[in-house]
Amino acid sequence: DAGRRRLLQLAAWASCAGAARASSIPVQIGVDAEFGLKDSTSAQAIEIGLRIAIAEVNAAGGVLGGRPLELVVRDNRSMPARAIAHFNAFTAMPDLVAVFGGKFSPVMMDVVPIAHELRLPLMAVWSSADPIVDHGRHPNFVFRLALRDSLAMPKLLKTALLRGFGQVGLLLANTGWGRSNLAAAERHLKSAQRPRITGVAWHNWGEKSLLARYMSLSESGAKAIIVVGNDDDVALLVRELATLPEEQRLPLLCHQGITGGKFAALAGPALQQVDLSVLQTFSFFSAEPERRDRFMKSAAKVAGIQSIEQLEAPTGTAHAYDLLHLLAIAIHRAGSADRTAVRDALEHLPTHRGLIKTYQPAFTPERHEALGEQDLLMARYRADGVLVPA
């Protein structure tokens, strides 16, 4: 009868309205990084990459039948206690599926146990210490699209040897990151033998001078120094080296850590007086033009970025951009925002044509590292402070 038909119509309308509301509820992505740290560019670069990729995913219809992605930003100021508190808060957000971390390996290493206890995927797009991914927990909730120390240190050692430096010194940050790199160097040299490490010197963050440590390595017979440190510390070293006679300035081969801040500005004119190169996973200058142009078109729309030169800490942006797109594919394949289902889907992704490369696939159940040795390159700073392939 008419009354029953009316009830059915109302029920159908309510069902459609409920579905529409459900499809408009955002799927949230967390990012917790060192935004408030003085001179940081890494956290900001990661956020830009995420926002550009999210805008592209949403413009193409979002995920799960039209749900938009939404970024939730937190600032851990590079403090592990803040990062852990933020991770706990992220877990309580029912529509949040994954958290992207920042630059600092010691912070990420402290978050890893919490990520597994709470079963929330943790995405590494900068931090490079091996134990962030190699922690022995199963199933593994950490996925990395970034440099890894056990790839970084062999690349730096091989580069030194190719340049004719048969003896090198290691100047390392006195943290889990520095220790991860020493372990990687020792593993590599078990089979490679050369270059010979003449000495290892450790430095703490915020030292007033690194010259004594540098001189000890120079006096040990090193012909080049491999440096694992952050922007402010290495900038101090560069300024100190520039005061030495030219013949006492050894080449510096640096881990990517220096690129996550205002390194060129902190080093100043001294940078052009020191032979310094830095490890990278990607350069927009050598990227495939079609992929780069597509990215730059979105970057102009979303972030007002008009040129490659405006991208500070460019690898952070590229890593975050590609990993966000891979995460969106995983959400689609999982068919829900269930965190464990998304984690499982990340291990079974199809081939994806990203900005950095074509991932075939990015991850497997046995491999949670999206980048390999073939993706690494050395770069140098131009006089205007822009990083270009060496």
Please report, for each region that a protein language model flagged, where it lies by residue.
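Hydrophobic h-region of N-terminal signal peptides that target proteins for export
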Residues: 13-21
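Extracytosolic ligand-binding ectodomains
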Residues: 3-10, 22-390
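Intrinsically disordered, low-complexity regions enriched in serine, threonine, proline
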Residues: 1-2, 18
